[in-house]
Amino acid sequence: AIAVELARDVFEAIQTLSRGSVFQDMPLVSNKELMDLR
């Protein structure tokens, strides 16, 4: 559970920092990776 929460925090931080950048094309992949952690 802790790992999932950590991943969520990191994911949110990356999304916030990289808006308008290359990561804009990768949200679906990142979401899939988060789902796999559960």
From Swiss-Prot:
Activity regulation info: The antimicrobial activity of BAC79 was completely lost after treatment with enzymes trypsin, pepsin, proteinase-K, and carboxypeptidase, while there was no loss of activity with either amylase or lipase.
Superkingdom to which the source organism belongs: Bacteria
pH dependence, record text: Optimum pH is between 2 to 4. Active from pH 2 to 6.
Temperature dependence: Thermostable. Retains activity up to 100 degrees Celsius, and when exposed to 121 degrees Celsius. Also retains activity after storage at 4 degrees Celsius for 4 months.
Entry keyword Magnesium: no
The entry's keywords: Antibiotic, Antimicrobial, Bacteriocin
GO terms of biological process kind: defense response to Gram-negative bacterium; defense response to Gram-positive bacterium; disruption of plasma membrane integrity in another organism; killing of cells of another organism
Described purpose of this protein according to its UniProt entry: Has antibacterial activity against a wide spectrum of Gram-positive and Gram-negative bacteria, including L.monocytogenes which is inhibited through disruption of the cell membrane.
Protein name: Bacteriocin BAC79
Organism, as annotated: Weissella confusa (Lactobacillus confusus)
Lineage: Bacteria, Bacillati, Bacillota, Bacilli, Lactobacillales
